[in-house]
Amino acid sequence: MTYNIVALPGDGIGPEILNGSLSLLEIISNKYNFNYQIEHHEFGGASIDTFGEPLTEKTLNACKRADAILLGAIGGPKWTDPNNRPEQGLLKLRKSLNLFANIRPTTVVKGASSLSPLKAERVEGTDLVIVRELTSGIYFGEPRYFNNHEALDSLTYTREEIERIVHVAFKLAASRRGKLTSVDKENVLASSKLWRKVVNEVSQLYPEVTVNHLLVDACSMHLITNPKQFDVIVYENLFGDILSDEASVIPGSLGLSPSASFSNDGPRLYEPIHGSAPDIAGKNVANPFGMILSLAMCLRESLNQPDAADELEQHIYNMIEHGQTTADLGGKLNTTDIFEILSQKLNH
């Protein structure tokens, strides 16, 4: 079997961190004996510059045919037209591929706790995964309107939308430490009352998973005071958007956090959570770890290469533990250095 991968370098530092990661993929495929082919397509601001829109039909169709999609980063101050922004291409891609589930791991590895803004003893050993519903909720609810006197956003969830994201979270928890925290605002929101009811019903299908309910404000505090207590956390869209960013600073840098977005069938999208950082683009100083860890997620989830994913992650964690990092993590290496060291480790 030959896996079909679509590469979307995007904007800013996106091309340099993605291209370097693809060089690692070539080494890994030879080492673990699997085949793949790459289609490169412009996306986001780069696509606006070339084609006048952030996501062309050609690129979208290629993504629909793919086994996996790797995205570098998109956006930047260059693209200011509110009706034609790079981010609109990502929203369209998510909707077209029905990418309803967003998965964000947060890990604080041994020796890296000093990077965190929190006390080392509070964060070392943190290993949690956030599951965020991505295509419903207040960002997509209707009706919505805005005028000079009043504005309205609608927070709507159906039973089916809640069930599908909750099943993802339960399955993930069952494969890890067997603990799921469901976050809502059940004390005031009707949508959260339905959310909690559905979670409790679905929990009957997963007796091996222990379920805990937290109100969103309490969860925001517990993420800071005791992040090690969490295994898998599931959120609706708005809560997940906010609190996944809170969780991402626990390791000390956005550059350490990968993510995956997927549907029940079809290709999955893998990308680091950081932005395009146009101020450092082309300077060879970008931290590529988030992109490389996203590649590891792709290896595990879409390319059926769990051993390769484990090896790649362990090499990264070992480098971080020994201070082999870029400047944002306190190290002295540049982007190229990171890829060269990882290439040597993988070839060893």
Curated annotation (Swiss-Prot):
<keyword id="KW-0100">Branched-chain amino acid biosynthesis</keyword>
<dbReference type="InterPro" id="IPR004429">
    <property type="entry name" value="Isopropylmalate_DH"/>
</dbReference>
<comment type="pathway">
    <text>Amino-acid biosynthesis; L-leucine biosynthesis; L-leucine from 3-methyl-2-oxobutanoate: step 3/4.</text>
</comment>
<feature type="site" description="Important for catalysis">
    <location>
        <position position="139"/>
    </location>
</feature>
<feature type="binding site">
    <location>
        <position position="245"/>
    </location>
    <ligand>
        <name>Mg(2+)</name>
    </ligand>
</feature>
<feature type="binding site">
    <location>
        <position position="241"/>
    </location>
    <ligand>
        <name>Mg(2+)</name>
    </ligand>
</feature>
<comment type="subunit">
    <text>Homodimer.</text>
</comment>
<feature type="binding site">
    <location>
        <position position="132"/>
    </location>
    <ligand>
        <name>substrate</name>
    </ligand>
</feature>
<keyword id="KW-0028">Amino-acid biosynthesis</keyword>
<feature type="binding site">
    <location>
        <position position="217"/>
    </location>
    <ligand>
        <name>substrate</name>
    </ligand>
</feature>
<dbReference type="GO" id="GO:0003862">
    <property type="term" value="F:3-isopropylmalate dehydrogenase activity"/>
</dbReference>
<feature type="binding site">
    <location>
        <begin position="76"/>
        <end position="87"/>
    </location>
    <ligand>
        <name>NAD(+)</name>
    </ligand>
</feature>
<keyword id="KW-0520">NAD</keyword>
<keyword id="KW-0963">Cytoplasm</keyword>
<comment type="function">
    <text>Catalyzes the oxidation of 3-carboxy-2-hydroxy-4-methylpentanoate (3-isopropylmalate) to 3-carboxy-4-methyl-2-oxopentanoate. The product decarboxylates to 4-methyl-2 oxopentanoate.</text>
</comment>
<keyword id="KW-0464">Manganese</keyword>
<feature type="binding site">
    <location>
        <position position="217"/>
    </location>
    <ligand>
        <name>Mg(2+)</name>
    </ligand>
</feature>
<feature type="binding site">
    <location>
        <position position="104"/>
    </location>
    <ligand>
        <name>substrate</name>
    </ligand>
</feature>
<comment type="similarity">
    <text>Belongs to the isocitrate and isopropylmalate dehydrogenases family. LeuB type 1 subfamily.</text>
</comment>
<dbReference type="InterPro" id="IPR019818">
    <property type="entry name" value="IsoCit/isopropylmalate_DH_CS"/>
</dbReference>
<dbReference type="GO" id="GO:0009098">
    <property type="term" value="P:L-leucine biosynthetic process"/>
</dbReference>
<dbReference type="Pfam" id="PF00180">
    <property type="entry name" value="Iso_dh"/>
</dbReference>
<feature type="site" description="Important for catalysis">
    <location>
        <position position="185"/>
    </location>
</feature>
<feature type="binding site">
    <location>
        <begin position="275"/>
        <end position="287"/>
    </location>
    <ligand>
        <name>NAD(+)</name>
    </ligand>
</feature>
<keyword id="KW-0460">Magnesium</keyword>
<protein>
    <recommendedName>
        <fullName>3-isopropylmalate dehydrogenase</fullName>
        <ecNumber>1.1.1.85</ecNumber>
    </recommendedName>
</protein>
<keyword id="KW-0560">Oxidoreductase</keyword>
<feature type="binding site">
    <location>
        <position position="94"/>
    </location>
    <ligand>
        <name>substrate</name>
    </ligand>
</feature>
<dbReference type="GO" id="GO:0000287">
    <property type="term" value="F:magnesium ion binding"/>
</dbReference>
<dbReference type="GO" id="GO:0005829">
    <property type="term" value="C:cytosol"/>
</dbReference>
<dbReference type="InterPro" id="IPR024084">
    <property type="entry name" value="IsoPropMal-DH-like_dom"/>
</dbReference>
<keyword id="KW-0479">Metal-binding</keyword>
<keyword id="KW-0432">Leucine biosynthesis</keyword>
<dbReference type="GO" id="GO:0051287">
    <property type="term" value="F:NAD binding"/>
</dbReference>
